Each structure stands twice: as structure tokens, then as C-alpha cells.
């Protein structure tokens, strides 16, 4: 699931 989480991001890249 796409989540805006810093620890757990599947479809989001950690900036």
C-alpha cells in the first residue's frame, strides 16, 4: 500500500 511513511514506503522514495 502506498504510504507517506519514512520508515515504510513502498511506492515512495526516501528523500
From Swiss-Prot:
One GO location term (cellular component): extracellular region
Main location: secreted
Localization terms from the record: Secreted
Extent of the signal sequence: none
Key words of the record: Neuropeptide, Secreted
Keyword Membrane: no
Function per UniProt: FMRFamides and FMRFamide-like peptides are neuropeptides.
Protein name as catalogued: Extended FMRFamide-12
Naturally occurring in which organism (per UniProt): Austrophasma rawsonvillense
